């Protein structure tokens, strides 16, 4: 047998060269191996088995005057005689007789060899060797530019520098402080996300240069998983690498030998492919199983005409067709390579995409062989080119700014700015800084990070050190994120608030925060072409429960509908823009809270009545005048909170009585004049706000509200309070200020749980001493004119002043 490994040297190359082998070269290499196996297999059969087997022909040449007996003998020699009829008395005996040629083994071998050389077509004889030779030529052509001294030296030098650039600690560490790493592109860049953080910093690696290394050799490292700082030795190595890249660029950009070499070897392969297809297609039919052999060796063998069998004809025929298929695929691949070589401008390489990704504009474009090698590397993995771009960029100023920022904002100084936000989380607000200090990620107790008006923010991998971080606020910030940081936020971030003015300030990575529970968006989502900011699908936010949009949309965005199945609370603050299309609300079957604020609604949307799980509805600051549709709320059995405040409602329909499950009701800031007694049939109400209306009279039926704890009638025209109000023994807050009241009933002493009382702005001349019976009422909870407070007995005043 012929071992295939013996031919490995024809295609063997350094493993590092694989980065310059695009997919088509790898594919043709595999095709070459397959064709090589066909050739080796055919050659092995040629060596191991008989090539041809011949037998002499007994038929004499035909003559014009042949006798009938000669013809009969010829027929007899080719036609077997019928067996004799057996005698019925004797047993049947058959004697097997062959045709005797009186030839010995040596003569047969001689005949076989002569017929093989003289009669067998050359294509059938040399087919496996042709396959082997053609394949070796293909393999040599594919790898010639790796072997030729003029090109291999440049390739080896480039691969050496490329590997050092890719693995340089500076590439990973220093760049994370200067630029923001782009969140990984869709698509797809999962191989990059599986790499170490060294690889992940690829796009933003474009931000450093040798001057950065020279001036700041010991910069704090963002990725603490590898090391704490960039030491002096690593800085010197990176500095030397910058110099190598500069010199290599000057040297390689001068010529285009690599491009010319690759084009020529590809053209040669295409020409060879056409030749192989042409002659193989024409000669494949010459591979025949039966071969007639006429050689003048009668004086040595006694025969001149022979009938031969080419033993491997059938197999060679199949192998030839298989070989033609492989060569065809190989040739088509080479044609595609030529198309790629001539269609693409491979002598120029633009880093425009990297510049856009990183926001660094000083990465220069390259040309000639340098550009060609970068194009080839992009076919292997574009990440190499992006990381290599680091050492073509000048960003020492940005590096210095980052260092100064870290020195200015020490961890102790940042801790002094910590405060508790509205969500009761420990928050660090940073406003109008030149960047994001790395020292922020040393404050491990941080729960909420608020960034305002900070451009080109980079969230590095070290955000993973903030184990308690659950909330992130980005107000007018253009933010990029390290992939490792994105992975951390996907697992830990619960609340995200984004205030944006344009698309750049709306982070694209937020759509992948699978554990995000609350999302607050503030910004214009208009369909103006000049400022077209749209939401992408939120379907990946599987845990999203609360969504708040403060914008100017005319309909509910489709992105919101994508999370309708698990959304529990939705708030739309529309800044006065009319919200007209609300049919998508019907899809939010699990919605429990809905706020439609300042949406210019004139009627209560009918789609709301389909939300059977709804518990709270807020229609603040709309243009509601009539609420007759309120009767449909009776189907919403779980509705407990209804806020129709800041509208233009003039009356409350009697259908309100059917909303027996209501516990909180707000009609403040409307134009209501008459308070219907039916309202108080909603006897579960605990919170009732009727402030800032034109109400003059409170029906005595208010005493039915035995669960009432909060009642506000502030800024109305009420002249007296019914005594039944004081039957609401659970009342804790009573606001009756800015009315026309002149007397406060002594029965107010029955409200033992009263802790807040506002009576300021009325016509009282004296306060009843029974206020002393309200033990929970203190001076801080009593809103009244100082002079009126002095009308209380001294012991009552002292009691209220006592904490």
From Swiss-Prot:
It is found in: Cell membrane; Endoplasmic reticulum membrane. Expressed at highest levels in skeletal muscle, and at moderate levels in heart, lung and peripheral blood leukocytes. SUPFAM superfamilies: L domain-like. The modification Phosphoserine is found at residues 212, 215. Its main location: membrane. Residues 1-22, 145-262, 340-803 are cytoplasmic. Disulfide bonds join 54-308, 115-293. It is a multi-pass membrane protein. One of its GO terms (biological process) is intracellular signal transduction. It catalyses: chloride(in) = chloride(out); iodide(out) = iodide(in); taurine(out) = taurine(in); 2',3'-cGAMP(out) = 2',3'-cGAMP(in). Residues 48-124, 285-314 are extracellular. Glycans are attached at residues 64, 70. Belongs to the LRRC8 family. This is Volume-regulated anion channel subunit LRRC8C. It comes from Homo sapiens.
